From Swiss-Prot:
The gene is ispD. SUPFAM superfamilies: Nucleotide-diphospho-sugar transferases. Catalyzes the formation of 4-diphosphocytidyl-2-C-methyl-D-erythritol from CTP and 2-C-methyl-D-erythritol 4-phosphate (MEP). The record marks 142, 198 as: Positions MEP for the nucleophilic attack. Gene3D superfamilies: Spore Coat Polysaccharide Biosynthesis Protein SpsA, Chain A. Its EC number is 2.7.7.60. Keywords: Isoprene biosynthesis, Nucleotidyltransferase, Transferase. This is 2-C-methyl-D-erythritol 4-phosphate cytidylyltransferase. Pathway: Isoprenoid biosynthesis; isopentenyl diphosphate biosynthesis via DXP pathway; isopentenyl diphosphate from 1-deoxy-D-xylulose 5-phosphate: step 2/6. Belongs to the IspD/TarI cytidylyltransferase family. IspD subfamily. One of its GO terms (biological process) is isopentenyl diphosphate biosynthetic process, methylerythritol 4-phosphate pathway.
Length: 218
């Protein structure tokens, strides 16, 4: 794959549902802060040429052993992504949530390769639960929907333009690839059959620890 890509690693969320005095992305997982599990995985990928960590200033010291740039988080996730993009110097950017510790090298490569063809791509899994709309309550076809994760790889200028448009519309994005959708670009979904965990509740951390202790995740 002929690609040089930046990583924007999001570490600015507060995580009220996690019920912890510190943001969940800095909670220890098997001996090191949660966010560093993702950072280590991306550092090993040769096409990731630049890493921007979006975090509060008082957490920057945690990343001092690593060659990274910093950006300040915003009020919304999309504000944090846009802040990170101001430090990006490459034409392609991969966005990853700091609360997603499991990063699979082959999947990052597949997502980025797909983005090269269409302008935007996101990691996805098939819906395994019954999904219903709320108003009115209706059962949705599981084969017609997908669960979206990170990484998401997008052309840097497309992502910037989509984020600016969302801000002008006062529109809150659900994920990064939706910024491309606002511009009429259909993101490619790369489906995974592996565990995709976003640490949201304390119980999630216990599950992640069990997985890391018994399997080679990366």
């Amino acid at each position: 794959m002929n690609l040089s890509c930046s990583l924007v690693l999001l570490g600015g969320g507060r995580g009220e549902r996690f019920n912890s005095p510190q943001p969940k992305q800095y909670t220890p997982l098997c001996g090191e802060p949660l966010i560093l599990h993702a950072l280590h995985s991306y550092q090993s990928l040769p096409f990731i040429q630049e890493i921007v960590v979006v975090c509060e200033e008082h957490y920057q010291e945690l990343f001092s052993p690593y060659s990274v740039k910093f950006a300040s988080p915003g009020a919304l996730r999309q504000d944090s992504v846009f802040s990170g993009l101001q430090q990006v110097s490459l034409p392609w950017v991969c966005v990853h949530d700091g609360v997603r510790p499991f990063v699979y090298a082959n999947e990052v490569s597949e997502v980025c390769s797909a983005a090269l063809k269409t302008g935007a791509a996101a990691l996805a899994t098939s819906a395994t639960y019954t999904i219903k709309s709320r108003t009115p309550v209706r059962t949705l076809d599981r084969d017609a929907v997908a669960v979206i994760h990170t990484p998401q790889c997008i052309n840097t200028e497309i992502l910037k333009e989509g984020l600016l448009l969302a801000n002008m519309m006062d529109f809150t994005l659900s994920d990064d690839s939706e910024a491309a959708e606002l511009l009429g670009i259909e993101p490619t979904l790369v489906f995974s059959n592996r565990v995709q965990m976003k640490i949201t509740y304390p119980e999630d951390l216990l599950f992640a620890e069990a997985l890391l202790s018994k399997a080679h995740i990366r």
